[in-house]
Curated annotation (Swiss-Prot):
This is GTP cyclohydrolase FolE2. HAMAP family: GTP_cyclohydrol_B. Keywords: Hydrolase. InterPro entries: GTP_cyclohydrolase_FolE2, GTP_cyclohydrolase_FolE2/MptA. Pfam families: GCHY-1. The record marks C224 as: May be catalytically important. It comes from Dinoroseobacter shibae (strain DSM 16493 / NCIMB 14021 / DFL 12). The keyword Glycoprotein does not apply. The gene is folE2. It catalyses: GTP + H2O = 7,8-dihydroneopterin 3'-triphosphate + formate + H(+).
Length: 367
């Protein structure tokens, strides 16, 4: 006699599961609460309507609710959790924090007392390999603790000390970015107007060494020396009117400051160093006589992008308040469909074998 033994380990398919679910739901609709509890309390969730063990939640915002110390202590704090919560490799993170939180900040200036400017702040700290994360709101709270002061590098350093302590980190960094106004005279008409310079101040504390940096975007006109000579050749040999091509150009000048409070490098000082290197800065207020003067100034100072980098370099080398530096220049060509670019560094601070793929795309003056 043959005896057939079914495969008891076979998993049910979807149709079999649906049939079993319908059977269980039909039984639950006629069973008592005690019977359901005896079988499995979760069966109650198969019944229509609200599950019996699901809480009724308030939907109105509790305006009168206040947080006391006990409630605050009960709140989960995942970022300060154990290292077992870390996802990915247990590796040190060099910078973690917040970027582009904005607030009005008052700054010292060389020529016009104190000015209040909208400032974008980036604050970050290092994170040890065994720590889950940081409480990022502490960076903002710490910064706001100093926000009413008139900022200088000394105030930035005190702020840095505070949030290194608050976040219990070894390394830290603050960068403050703003648009700084300076009144600029026209070339010949006697008019004046405000030129705005994108400036960033940065304090970095790594391995117990603290360093201060200033970054400036300087916008100027560059006339191509080759195009100038070719235009003159057409005029001289063929009597043909021709104009050289020139274009708006941007140099991002980053300098490490070695000076102290008594001999600081002011915002205005760095602008003037750049203007000394390349005098064809774009103009603010322009009448006809100023436009003619600007054409003459460009003709007297034709410049390739290589010349621009080296001209800035010479001006920066001559200032004892400046240590390492970097110049990134972009001539946004009116002749070509591409730009001409150059990068010059002095000292190890800014030296790099690799460049941010979008570095030169950030060198645009958008007005």
């Amino acid at each position: 006699m043959n005896v057939y033994t079914p495969d008891i380990d076979k998993l049910p398919n979807r149709d079999e599961a649906a049939t079993a679910l319908a059977t269980l739901r039909a039984w639950a609709q006629t069973a008592s609460a005690a019977e359901i509890e005896t079988l499995d309390p979760s069966v109650a969730r198969l019944l229509p309507g609200d599950p019996s063990d699901y809480p009724s939640l308030a939907r109105a915002y509790p305006e009168e609710f206040s947080v006391d110390a006990a409630y605050k202590d009960s709140l989960p704090d995942l970022q300060n959790g154990p290292s077992s919560l870390i996802r990915g490799a247990k590796a040190q993170i060099q910078h973690v924090g917040i970027s582009n939180f904005r607030l009005p900040i008052r700054f010292h200036t060389r020529d016009n007392g104190d000015v209040t400017l909208e400032t974008s702040v980036t604050g970050s700290v290092s994170l040890e390999a065994e720590k889950k994360g940081i409480n990022m709101s502490r960076i903002m709270r710490t910064f706001y603790g100093h926000a009413d002061e008139t900022f200088s590098f000394e105030v930035i350093e005190r702020t840095l000390d505070a949030y290194k302590s608050d976040l219990e980190s070894f390394d830290a960094r603050i960068q403050m970015r703003f648009s700084f106004p300076m009144k600029v005279e026209s070339l010949r008409s006697g008019l004046s107007g405000y030129q705005y310079y994108d400036i960033a101040l940065e304090v970095v504390d790594v391995n117990g060494q603290r360093r201060k940096f200033m970054h400036l975007d300087y916008v100027y006109s560059s006339t191509c020396p080759c195009s100038l000579e070719l235009s003159e050749h057409a005029r001289q040999f063929r009597g043909q009117l021709a104009t050289p091509h020139s274009q708006r150009s941007v140099a991002r000048v980053s300098v490490e400051l070695t000076c102290g409070a008594d001999d600081c490098l002011w915002f205005e000082d760095l602008v003037e160093l750049c203007r000394e290197a390349i005098p064809t800065e774009t103009q603010v207020m322009v009448k006809r006589e100023d436009e003619q003067a600007f054409a003459e100034l460009n003709a007297a100072n034709p410049i390739f992008v290589e010349d621009a980098a080296r001209s800035f370099c010479l001006a920066l080398q001559r200032d004892d308040r400046i240590g390492d530096f970097r110049v990134v220049a972009s001539h946004q060509e009116s002749l070509h469909s591409h730009d001409a670019v150059s990068v010059l560094t002095e000292g190890p601070t800014f030296a790099s074998d690799s460049l941010d793929p979008r570095l030169f795309q950030t060198l645009f003056h958008v007005g």
